[in-house]
């Protein structure tokens, strides 16, 4: 049985798209599915093995510390395919690919355009710089992935 591991550091454990549409569909198709996600316990729900991540303690925690937890917990599944859902996991996706794994990046939103509206990033020139750096890194990172799934054509 082929093992697939979905990874999210930002979405709720029973997200409609990730858990209900993608993970459960894979289970029904005969795959061994794990989901590394913020959750309170190890359990199997509708055939999906839930691998818990600790609750987020702010943006920096989620983007730096939680991504490390997610990467190492995902590795422990020893899956053949890794499907991640959050841009802060792009480096983990590159590392997984370097390790010979199949990697899918599921881009749910247009992050570079959202950066323009995130006041916590700084003033407008700083946001423009961050946006352009993100775009460059994203273009570099997707060269490593086997597949990129997007919800709209502009992504």
Sequence positions of predicted segments:
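Extreme N-terminal starter segment of soluble prokaryotic enzymes
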Residues: 1-5
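N-terminal strand-loop element at the rim of the active site
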Residues: 6-65, 154-155
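A short, histidine- and acid-enriched strand-loop-helix "catalytic/donor-clamping" loop
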Residues: 13-15, 79, 105-124, 147
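Short, hinge-like loop/turn segments at secondary-structure boundaries
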Residues: 49-53, 100, 121-125
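Membrane-proximal helix-turn-helix segments that form the acceptor-binding/catalytic region
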Residues: 68-75, 95-99, 105, 111, ...
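Short N-terminal targeting/anchoring amphipathic segment
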Residues: 73-90, 101-104
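Alpha-helix/helix-capping structural signal
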Residues: 88, 153-154
């Amino acid at each position: 049985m082929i093992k697939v591991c979905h990874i999210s550091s930002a979405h709720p454990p029973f997200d409609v798209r990730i858990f209900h549409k993608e993970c459960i569909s894979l289970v029904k198709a005969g795959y061994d599915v794990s989901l590394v996600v913020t959750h309170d316990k190890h359990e199997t729900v509708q055939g999906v093995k839930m691998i818990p991540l600790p609750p987020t303690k702010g943006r920096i925690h989620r983007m730096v510390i939680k991504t490390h937890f997610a990467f190492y917990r995902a590795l422990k599944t020893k899956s053949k395919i890794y499907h991640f859902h959050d841009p802060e996991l792009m480096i983990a996706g590159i590392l997984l690919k370097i390790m010979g794994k199949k990697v899918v990046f599921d881009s749910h939103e247009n992050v570079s355009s959202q950066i323009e509206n995130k006041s916590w990033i700084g003033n407008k020139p700083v946001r423009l710089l961050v946006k352009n750096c993100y775009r460059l890194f994203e273009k570099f990172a997707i060269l490593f992935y086997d597949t990129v799934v997007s919800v709209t054509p502009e992504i």
